[in-house]
Regions:
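Active-site-adjacent substrate/metal-binding segments within catalytic domains
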Residues: 1-111, 129-164, 237, 243-244, ...
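Conserved, mostly hydrophobic/aromatic
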Residues: 5, 91, 99, 171, ...
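Polysaccharide-binding and catalytic clefts of secreted carbohydrate-active enzymes
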Residues: 27-79, 165-291
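Active-site clefts of carbohydrate-active enzymes
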Residues: 60-71, 129-141, 233-251, 284, ...
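Substrate-binding cleft/loops of secretory-pathway carbohydrate-active enzymes
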Residues: 106-114, 179-187, 277-313, 379-391
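Substrate-binding cleft of secreted/luminal carbohydrate-active enzymes
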Residues: 166-170, 174-176, 330, 345-398, ...
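Aromatic-rich peripheral "rim/lid" segments of glycoside hydrolase catalytic domains that contact
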Residues: 188-202, 376-441
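Glycoside hydrolase catalytic-domain groove-lining segments
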Residues: 252-343, 358-365
Length: 441
């Protein structure tokens, strides 16, 4: 519910911005025309320096935004304010009550048209999630180290400028951590295989000593010949294959590691900003129960979830965490007009996109745990790809700001009835969409 006690079911839309930038440096020869960088359309140019830890994003791109060029042509110097007026009226008409995180930091929220000209409810990204110089696996840090605690304090300090802004509903600590893309990952197994002496290895040894009377009992249980617990500092590859007891111990310590991964920055964030809700990690999916470790340090358990029917999945996650669950990304694209790629989930037509939206959101709303979702994304992507190397036909509007009425009308229908569905006073929309195979890479 909101601060005044009214029910608030998130009907969100991600990256509500005037345009959608496309990469130039890799595709320059494919453009028949590009504007001068210091000319009339200078505001359409930008540069992006990617996070080197995100393999899915290009490291550097020089971008141009033809949607923004169209707005400048239409409205001249007042283009930004005109776009904001138009978009705010549309969001209200569609029943959208949250504009997502929009790739914030603070400057994106406050300096975007929707931040300048209105106070539209939104979320916030805290910053770059804390890392340690030596990681356990991919971007998973040495979570019991002093370094991790110090980096978490720096991370949480990023909330200081926004802690009193009332139209920010809450914050995400990160988005789709790279380590979480391995469906059968046992993070403690990666710890034992690591060649360096990490602080978390010392904690693991203490954990094992607490479970076994002596080194002989441990060696027998794990089918591992070592002379002392200190020998566990020596890399042990594929430890899950040793014996059943090893799998049980590793699973238990993985939970402890993931819990610490969430706990340390979450507590630091709450110290700095007690006013906003912590929505967590935007995991790409939950493949095993240990991924929910640390949920008690969050206010809402959030996931990105690309499927057609979330009901069973939401109920499963809700049963693990026993707290509100939100979806921060989902979409369904089509190929009957516009861009040539469906996105992560495809349906046959634009009309079926509306069917898919209603089916997804209302099926979720019929569960006890679901508190809303944020559709990805507001605008169709550039035909020659964004800096995430995507050109998906998934927007609410096209490059000329023309709405895809088939989906926006459907969103409005769901917005009108979703509170009754959530309260059990109405049945959810139950027309399954006509699914087609995705053609995204």
């Amino acid at each position: 519910m909101d601060p005044e006690g009214y029910a608030y079911f998130v009907m969100g839309l991600e990256m509500v911005a005037p345009g959608s930038s496309g990469v130039v440096n890799e595709w320059r020869d494919s453009y028949t025309w590009l504007p001068e960088k210091d000319g009339e359309y200078a505001e359409a140019w930008s540069e992006m320096h990617g996070d080197p830890n995100q393999a899915r994003r290009v490291a550097y791109s020089e971008d141009v935004d033809f949607a923004k060029i169209n707005l400048i042509r239409a409205y001249g110097k007042a283009w930004e304010h005109k776009w904001a007026d138009l978009t705010i009226s549309r969001l209200n008409a569609w029943g959208i009550n949250n504009v997502g995180a929009s790739g914030s930091p603070l400057t994106r929220i406050m300096n975007s048209p929707l931040g300048k000209y209105c106070q539209y409810p939104c979320f916030h990204f805290v910053g770059v999630y804390p890392r340690t110089k030596v990681s356990v696996f991919r971007d998973f840090p040495d979570v019991f180290s002093k370094e991790y605690e110090e980096e978490s304090s720096k991370f949480a300090a990023c909330l200081e400028p926004i802690k009193d802004i009332p139209f920010i509903v809450g914050y995400f600590m990160t988005n789709e951590p790279e380590w979480a893309f391995i469906e059968d990952l046992e993070i403690s197994e990666m710890l034992l295989a690591h060649p360096e002496h990490l602080v978390t290895k010392d904690v693991f040894i203490e954990f094992i000593q607490g479970r076994y009377a002596d080194i002989e009992a441990f060696s027998q249980a794990w089918n591992l010949k070592i002379d002392s617990f200190a020998d566990l500092l020596t890399p042990i590859p594929e430890a899950r294959k040793l014996f059943k007891a090893a799998r049980c111990d590793l699973d238990a310590f993985s939970y402890i590691m993931i819990e610490q991964y969430i706990k340390v920055p979450a507590l630091k964030c709450k110290e700095v900003d007690p006013n906003h809700l912590n929505f967590g990690m935007r995991y790409p999916y939950i493949a095993y129960a240990n991924q929910t470790a640390g949920h008690q340090y969050l206010d809402v358990f959030d996931i990105n979830d690309y499927r057609y029917d979330p009901k069973e999945y939401i109920n499963w996650i809700g049963s693990l965490v026993n707290m509100p669950v939100m979806v921060s990304e989902f979409h369904h694209g089509s190929l009957d007009r516009g861009l040539p790629v469906t996105g992560i989930r495809g349906v046959r037509t634009q009309e079926e996109r509306g069917v898919a939206y209603r089916y997804y959101v209302e099926r979720g709303a019929s569960t006890d745990y679901f508190v809303g979702s944020v559709y990805f994304v507001f605008s169709d992507q550039p035909v020659l790809c964004s800096n995430y190397q995507e050109n998906y036909n998934i927007g609410f509007v096209d490059i000329c700001q023309m709405p895809h009425r088939e989906i926006t009308d459907a969103v409005r229908e769901t917005a009108i009835r979703v509170y009754n569905v959530h309260a059990g006073k109405a049945s959810n929309y139950d027309h399954r969409p006509d699914i087609i195979p995705l053609n995204a890479c």
